[in-house]
């Protein structure tokens, strides 16, 4: 699970209305495949604002190594969150719930088989898998899809090259 300071920054940032600046939106969409743009647009305004910042930091950190698939990975790493339909306060409850259950995959899977708010919490906690599935269906580069699936895993479980994963992770937890 993300560090407390990262979660606090994301929470307070999500309270600010609006998405990224128009220039950042235009830049972000220029980094995405046509099939990825609808996924980007389905993300919440705060998630898009956060993701644009992550991608800009990745671009600065990696320079020429920040290829289109790497920047798409930065922009779409949280795309699975949109499947839950939870707002800011629901996400807070989901994050706390995930911590309480130790992110037990069997409990999370059971929650996704229910209805209403509990199902949405389960979906939110599965956002890495759901995001990877969405990106796979969109025909995203394997690196982009893998990072969505792996961005909450320990480094020794990443399949993306370590230098790229470290830059993506550092930019997200900045």
Q: Regions from the language model: what does each represent?
A:
Residues 37-50, 55-174:
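Divalent metal-dependent catalytic cores for phosphoryl transfer on phosphate-bearing substrates
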